[in-house]
Amino acid sequence: MCSGNGTNFENIVTHPNCNKDEVVLMIYNKKKCGAVKRAAKWGIPHCYVSHKDEDRMIELLKAWNVELIILAGYMIVIKNPAAFPCPIINVHPSLLPKYKGLHAVEQAINNKELVTGCSVHYVNEELDGGEVIMQGEVPILPEDTIKSLTKAIQRKEYAILPAAIEHVKQQLLQQAS
């Protein structure tokens, strides 16, 4: 599920450990979402669903037999994750539990942190409060701005999100056997 440019989505689709055929659907919630072009480029079915219509999302996910939901730059809080038909994971630009919610990068800079990073975690009822699956650290350089640090964190996300997805897929396979 995406809200923005779709770079994390495309990174998942093109990653060597990813079987593109396993990416069955991309749901987006902004009509001018850049991820739409990326989904079309890779032949991934995509569908607009308002973030206010979680019932429609659930209906689509069930119809497409989705086994894992990945929030790749989906900038809306899932109100009732327990109602979804499968696990949901999210990538967040901080080393959780620090700096939950919006403005995590700005908070890390303002608090003069030396290191920040990103976390992939399960989504639960608490905002950015689910079990952490994987984290990656990014040093904060003295010259870093919100923009430069955000880009550095995104590069780290590109490395850890596919690894976290593979980890979760293996867990799901073990549970099924």
Task: Please state what every model-predicted region is.
Residues 1-177:
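One-carbon transfer enzymes
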